[in-house]
Amino acid sequence: MTAPSPRPSPDPIAHLVARALDAVAAPRRAVIGVDPDGKHTAVCVLWSDGAVDLAGGGTRADGAPLCTCTGALATLRTVGLPAVAGVYVETQNPHSPWSAAVEPCRRSRYMWEAACELTASTLRPTAPQAWQRVLAKLAAPHHRTSTLSDYGPLADALAAQLGAKLANGDQRAAFGLALFGAHSLGWDLGPSA
């Protein structure tokens, strides 16, 4: 009796793209952490079917604090929601040790702007057509800061899906894909230096 042939390992590129498409096809809810006043506080924004709810300060039932942006990020990872937009931190002193510790959060400003526009939220003023900047950043190879050794195939796959969604006029889905790619791979969507 011959041994069964080993099952092929799943294609990580196809898996990530499928996960992204699933997230934007039926976004049950999503969470954004934000520091709205530069005082190291955080607010979680949850939306489902267009409804936006806010929760800030204190802790969640799972014990992850929402009073800091680091805690907000931990909450997003713990809850494992289908779409995570990111954290936007703004501080008066960009050279302070605290600011340096949350550099990945500070770089997510465009992600927060995009999420506001995506949810038609007025929680924070959003620059006109912020989604275009997000997609442009996603498409520009010199803006990618992924630690993966080979993100080219994934970038190409996401770009193809983005193009298809935009061609169909589905900007919301394209937005979700852009945010998914940025969050999952750690791409820098912040302003150019």
Show where each model-derived region lies:
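Phosphate- and other anionic-substrate recognition elements at nucleic-acid/protein interfaces
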Residues: T2-A193
